[in-house]
């Protein structure tokens, strides 16, 4: 073990015993208690292997050549309060006199002695003594006044910053074990306590040699409550808790001091809850006493107070290895994290523990500081770890002090909010986070400006307070930055982010891909997928599918952007995009009349007649077939508003491979659909199969059918049923693929606007399936036949609701069609100003329109009948707007008169009615219609 130069014999001190008599008591008027030979210099001190030193031996100066022994005794007898006052006077002297050459002799010797003991690690073969304090040409800087205040003296700061964290390997000093013990001392621990366990049987004198322990032992330093810790700690301990191991522990042995690795004792200090919150250091509190101090002094000096972070040793080791092996840290100004020692440090060459690659989020030397966004792989870590860059080289003087990187939020500063997905920020590649694994950054030091501190704190709270996306499970995150990139490009936001800025910067895929609930991918058919999946039968239509980036630039169809101006049906000059396809006016009118008139055209030939400008009127059957094959649908004109979907093909959609991979439950059904005019489609699409699996269970109203019906009892039972169905709608919508990708406010708005439509639509489906539309099947325990309807006070309302199951009976709606129509009902009303995530909403709605087309194609054999079917079903959805408006009006009137009518309204239902129904009835919402009235 590296040998240590002893400072001189001291009074014995036993670990756990009372404090040393030399500490904590004023000794100005009495001689020294123990022998302290003044003639003995540091060059002739005996060598020992290790000594159990506490901080009571760190506050006394080393003798210097040419210094009077009386001065030594005077310094030796200074109390801690006198030492602190000396520091303050030195600061005031420095601030008043500008940049002097050196501090007063007494203070200089004291500071040098303390720093020689505190901050001087040693290598394996370094045993030469340190030069005396009086021979040191440049004074050490610990408390701030010694920092240069004028720009010409700025390079001297660079020489100061590096030794503060880790001295160079050529500097002689104490043994690595003792130096590490000095650095590890946490705040609040009394300097009179023993930090190293003495070997049993060995004397506790500072001059006695101690044999190194064969195995490193972990010592838990418990901080006890009491004033003695606070008073005896001295100014050296007034700050934040120190980081475990200091700079010496960052080299490869992660969190284990070199002394412990060589057989010493590793300190594992316990965190005290009293000191978990960030506190202002003594240097910052005394800032007004030194008006001449530069702001760099205040900013940099708090960087020795690194709080204790109980991280995993393997994590620290792997993090250190990555910092040491990264090429970006070997060149330039050498900006290193607090975990990375200087290149000259002997600990930098030690072998780290290989655990795997971790994201490298340290900012480059020539870039602005970026937020630390890599996630923590353990539980919530209360203390904040501040990583301050160690600046080397001439470029450090030209750069302003950087703020800290925070690897964990402090619970005392930030409350525990559920992590959420904030919207992406354009200037910096963005957490939804969603989730609890996301780490937000905020300043943890009082040296950071108040404006940036408050902004970061507000940003952290906003990011946590927003709605969280579905939990993604313990997925391993991708690398934080691309190879060769020096900046952290990981998006902060937990939401699916496909921003162009992150892609242009070369960032890796986002930590959280665009997923819906239960890990389902986000719905949406990209133009490239559509082009690849189109069958070879329709090559002319490939030119009309524009990429998303081009489509998002223009909100509507641009006639000039299309490659040609001919009708896709007959080849005549096109007049515009009609019903989703570029056609002429003649084919537009023909298609509208053919679909709305419900004509059954028959071809006299073999269904392969030529349709051109001259012969387009010869065979209406082939002309209509060609219109449907081109993708014309009566609701196609509404798709002009959608940015992502430009061409909707009614029957080609079933010919495309599924871009949405449904995991697990639908793998057997995720087959590619092919379509030909004479082939039937029998397989159920995976998404429709998923909609079947998330259908809510049967809900009961709790109505007592043994008692005679009264108006108040029926309405109260219906309200109780409505409350339960509203909760069911919320649960169902969360499981709906694509719905959780919307903003949380948009999700709430859509549910509040459409809950009545969903309830009455479900009522119609149950009445159609269970009683063939002859009665109103509200619930298994609440079925109203026509007689009970007449006896109720809302008979006219029952007749209005009865129209829906009768339409189901007339159209013979299938379950697949009902499920797709139900989702479209959820998406059929939006605010007048639009939604926050309008693009995702339009993409989701367009996807479910295509699913409805697929559901229609499961039963309809011809293209003509399929298009007619689509028109009939979408017309039913449009008619529901007027029907539901009557229900809204009756519900609001009943709610207003609920006390007079003795009708009870549940709490959640009351909130929705009071907040949204007046807005809906006042026309402050925008219904989305498939057809013009």
Curated annotation (Swiss-Prot):
A motif (LXXL motif 2) lies at residues 115-119. Its main location: nucleus. Residues 456-546 are annotated as: AF1. Phosphorylated on multiple serine sites. Several of these sites are hormone-dependent. Phosphorylation on Ser-294 is highly hormone-dependent and modulates ubiquitination and sumoylation on Lys-388. Phosphorylation on Ser-102 and Ser-345 also requires induction by hormone. Basal phosphorylation on Ser-81, Ser-162, Ser-190 and Ser-400 is increased in response to progesterone and can be phosphorylated in vitro by the CDK2-A1 complex. Increased levels of phosphorylation on Ser-400 also in the presence of EGF, heregulin, IGF, PMA and FBS. Sumoylation is hormone-dependent and represses transcriptional activity. Sumoylation on all three sites is enhanced by PIAS3. Desumoylated by SENP1. Sumoylation on Lys-388, the main site of sumoylation, is repressed by ubiquitination on the same site, and modulated by phosphorylation at Ser-294. A motif (LXXL motif 1) lies at residues 55-59. Residues 418-433 have a biased composition (Pro residues). Residues 1-566 are annotated as: Modulating, Pro-Rich. A motif (Nuclear localization signal) lies at residues 183-187. Residues 567-639 bind DNA. There is a cross-link at residues 388, 531 (Glycyl lysine isopeptide (Lys-Gly) (interchain with G-Cter in SUMO)). Residues 220-231 have a biased composition (Acidic residues). Residues 679-913 form the NR LBD domain. A zinc finger (NR C4-type) spans 567-587, 603-627. Residues 165-305 are annotated as: Mediates transcriptional transrepression. InterPro entries: NHR-like_dom_sf, Nucl_hrmn_rcpt_lig-bd, Nuclear_hormone_rcpt_NR3, Nuclear_hrmn_rcpt, Progest_rcpt, Znf_hrmn_rcpt, Znf_NHR/GATA. One of its GO terms (molecular function) is ATPase binding. Progesterone binds at residue 766. GO terms for cellular component: chromatin; cytoplasm; nucleoplasm; nucleus; plasma membrane. Residues 1-256, 331-378, 415-452 are annotated as: Disordered. It is found in: Nucleus; Cytoplasm. Residues 1-164 are annotated as: AF3. Belongs to the nuclear hormone receptor family. Interacts with SMARD1 and UNC45A. Interacts with CUEDC2; the interaction promotes ubiquitination, decreases sumoylation, and represses transcriptional activity. Interacts with PIAS3; the interaction promotes sumoylation of PR in a hormone-dependent manner, inhibits DNA-binding, and alters nuclear export. Interacts with SP1; the interaction requires ligand-induced phosphorylation on Ser-345 by ERK1/2-MAPK. Interacts with PRMT2. Interacts with NCOA2 and NCOA1. Interacts with KLF9. Interacts with GTF2B. The steroid hormones and their receptors are involved in the regulation of eukaryotic gene expression and affect cellular proliferation and differentiation in target tissues. Transcriptional activator of several progesteron-dependent promoters in a variety of cell types. Involved in activation of SRC-dependent MAPK signaling on hormone stimulation. This is Progesterone receptor. The lineage of its organism: Eukaryota, Metazoa, Chordata, Craniata, Vertebrata.
